């Protein structure tokens, strides 16, 4: 679907380092996320997708945040705070998502963690 830019809120245009995740999904798809690697000036998301926009535009932080949010511990925690919405869907409210605590080591440590995880994925 194409809309004139004047009809699109600037805050929903995808930017480099944004993370996107479904707001309403099946339980097994909770925390399925993607990181936006470059500005996408003509791309937005729909109403059932969250944009998680890190306060820092640093790629190291964005990659670390994605890895942390997809870790088994945080996935299980986020699953535990979702609401069932209908027969088969779960809803992650912004208010509940905002309560998730994520450990944030210094940026140099985040880089080391990112590198180790990337090396492990290359071995798969």
Question: What does each of the following model-derived ranges do?
Answer:
Residues 3-6, 58, 67:
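Alpha-helix N-cap/helix-initiation motif
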């Amino acid at each position: 679907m194409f809309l004139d830019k004047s009809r699109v809120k600037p805050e929903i245009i995808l930017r480099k380092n944004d993370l996107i995740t479904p707001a309403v999904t099946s339980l097994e798809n909770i925390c399925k996320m993607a990181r936006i690697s470059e500005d996408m000036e003509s791309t937005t998301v729909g109403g059932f997708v969250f944009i998680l926009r890190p306060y820092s535009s640093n790629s190291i932080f964005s990659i670390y945040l994605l890895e942390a949010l997809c870790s088994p511990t945080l996935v299980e925690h986020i699953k535990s705070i979702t609401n069932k919405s209908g027969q088969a869907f779960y809803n992650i409210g912004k208010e509940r998502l905002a309560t998730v605590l994520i450990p944030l080591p210094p940026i140099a440590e985040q880089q080391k963690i990112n590198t180790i995880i990337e090396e492990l994925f290359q071995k798969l």
